[in-house]
A protein has these predicted regions:
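Two-component/phosphorelay signaling modules centered on CheY-like receiver
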Residues: 12-31
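Short amphipathic alpha-helix used as the core "switch/output" element in two-component signaling
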Residues: 41, 63-77
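Active-site beta3 strand of CheY-like receiver
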Residues: 46-57
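Two-component signal transduction core modules
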Residues: 51, 81, 104-105
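Alpha4 helix (beta4-alpha4-beta5 surface) of REC/receiver domains from two-component response regulators
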Residues: 63, 67, 88-105
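C-terminal output helix
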Residues: 91, 109-121
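CheY-like receiver
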Residues: 116-119, 123-148
Length: 148
């Protein structure tokens, strides 16, 4: 069964890039949200295996995303949440990691970022390590990720 992902990011371009990468690995983005309210509604209805959450989905500099993260973790404590951000805020990163985020990856994405993402997901979802499920031609996706 494919890994079911809820993708939360206010940028359509970033959602496209991340969705393409998840699908190349054999996963499925089952829902996308561009703000915290949409994300919480979808989280409660689509039952994802993983949430990929951008810190900047609210105008509060990450505080709204952290509050959303805490609500999700209180409702489903074992839910893996991967945080992505263009904000280099070490204290916020530490807060997410301390509270149980799978990891906190920085944008813009590079080929190395996608390799980190793949390794994290394979660790959490071993079925993604199957030899037939490979990151197919990630270079064009990585080029798109740094365009802008």
């Amino acid at each position: 069964m494919a890994m079911r992902v809820l993708l939360v990011d206010d940028s359509v371009m970033v959602r496209d890039i991340v969705r393409n990468h998840v699908e190349c690995m054999g996963g499925s983005v089952v829902a996308e949200a561009e703000n915290t309210m949409q994300a919480l509604d979808l989280f409660r209805t689509v039952n994802p295996d993983l949430v990929i959450l951008d810190v900047a989905v609210s105008q509060t500099g990450g505080i709204g995303a952290l509050a959303l993260f805490r609500i999700m973790r209180s409702e489903v404590p074992e839910m893996p949440v991967l945080v992505i951000s263009g904000l280099a805020l070490p204290d916020l990163r530490r807060s997410f990691i301390r509270e149980g985020a799978l990891d906190y990856l920085f944008k813009p994405f590079t080929p190395r970022t996608f390799e980190q993402l793949r390794n994290l997901l394979v660790e959490r979802f071993p079925e993604l390590a199957h030899p037939m499920i490979q990151v197919r031609n990630a270079a064009p996706i990585a080029r798109l990720a740094t365009a802008g």
